[in-house]
Amino acid sequence: TRNAQLTTFVSSLMVLDAVERLGIEPSFCAGHSLGEYTALTATGALGFDEGVRLVCERSDAMFHAGNDNIGTMAAVLGLDDDQVEVACRRADNDVWVANFNAPGQVVIAGSPEGVAAASVIAKELGAKKVMPLQVAGAFHTPFMAPARDRLRKAIALADPRDTEVPVISNVDSLAHNTGLEWSSLLSAQLSSPVRWKHCLLTMAELGVRDFVELGPGGVLTGMAKRTVDGARTISVATPEELDKLLEWLDTGTPRVATQHEGEHLFAVERLVVSPAAGVFVPLGEVHDGTHIAVGTVLGHVGEAEVRSPFAGVLQSYIAVDGERVTPRQPIAWLRTV
């Protein structure tokens, strides 16, 4: 959904912001599916505003494409990539490999009938387990072609820039730092399989052994361990986990970053988070573009008021009216200067 994608994107960049202040800089960046937009914003190929607009356009386009072509996805565990592709071909229906995540971890997607047929065949071929996924469409398959066409126009307007730090593409698992290349790669990603395993192997071939996952989840860390022999991995989900990262890097004194090509959030972008679990209801008179003072009530979660601890301009609500939220889940995005 739009809100889930935007929340993940902004939350990941807030962690990146904290890491950058320590002077920790990457040799390469990569992101799984939506995470590719975070990686491009981190390296400066996209500005923060451009990234937000593209993520919103992408999620909306995927939602409508999913409604036009009803589809589903399933994780196939314990079967080689080529055998999963055989299962899809033998199903003789609309079903394809959508994610090559790690050795023995592949996701298929397509029509409900196609995924069901391929799942049965995958088990016959020796899959240890096939797990249906609760998703709103057959992402990264030809079912997303309408979304790809719509997103292509938005990407052209964003005009991705060249970067010094290369980003590994989901589409071809190669390192790219030319903005013009990303104009086509990002739109192709929607209807092409995510070659995440191959992205990890590309980084390993380029000499990467330390993999740091930033943002909510922690799933990619496990994939790196399964894919790259001798990989050192760590997941940093929140800025509060920076001490863990410093210890992992065996750094006694934080270094000061002298140069960074990506988008600095620092004191500019802020998230207002939920004070409790419950159903969020925004205040009707507070809209996008409203100037917010410290302590302004943006809405309620149950009986708890959602107050902004920052002054700034409301850019967007991340949670929608009636959405069930958890404590500290992002509710709104403000720009403070």
What residue spans do the PLM features occupy?
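Alpha/beta catalytic cores of group-transfer enzymes, especially the acyltransferase/condensing modules
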Residues: Q5, T43-S191
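Short phosphate-engaging motifs
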Residues: D80-Q83, G114, L220, E241, ...
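FabD-like malonyl-/acyl-CoA
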Residues: T1-V84, K129, L133, D210-P239
